[in-house]
Amino acid sequence: MKRPVITPRSRTFPRLRRRTAALAAVALSLVLTGTGCSGGGTPSPAAAGAAPKAAPVVSGPLCDLLPSGSDPGNPAALAGQPAEAALQWLPVLTTFEAAVRASGMSADLRGGSGVTILAPTDDAFAAKFSEDDLDHLLLADRDTLRGLLREHLVAGSRSLSDLVAAGKVTTLAGTTVTVTGGGGGSARLADRADTVCADYQVAGARIHIINHVLGNLPTTGGPGGHRAH
């Protein structure tokens, strides 16, 4: 059963708005980095001599199903965006993005020292919470929602290799999460979640998409977790 809209505003964005935003981002990129022309039409030395910047590389089994190449929302297009804006372009993170907005925690994703975001997929939220419980979290229990989101935030912008090398990290909720390397460019978190597309580089943050909701809230989702009638 398809879950109805449960956020203060639509959890998805019209294609026209996305396309307009993409065109605006391209135009801004061209102004900032593209032609580098002076008033006399001569390319600036910085623009003429700069080497092309390597495109961000994401890894994990879900990456092939997410925007890539020249698609809006591809890793390179998201690289300079604020985290809360970048989340809107990732189609498997509509619930997480809605939770960030509903909780009022967008500013927490723009911390000066950076942040690592362990973002569960929509399927992960559906497996964890019933539709009624998820509605309640998003619309009526802001404190619990903020606590849940802090279970998925780590201070500092850390790549997947950084997390694996550390072996464990502490979330903003104060929970210690173990991190072990896995195959196919993935990692295992808290012995229950795997990264499925890691290393989105956005402004001041890294986004790692994971397949399980972290934290200790009770599980009410799954096959029996549909909305009560």
Give, region by region, the residue ranges found by the protein language model.
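Mature, structured domains of secreted/extracytosolic soluble proteins
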Residues: 2-229
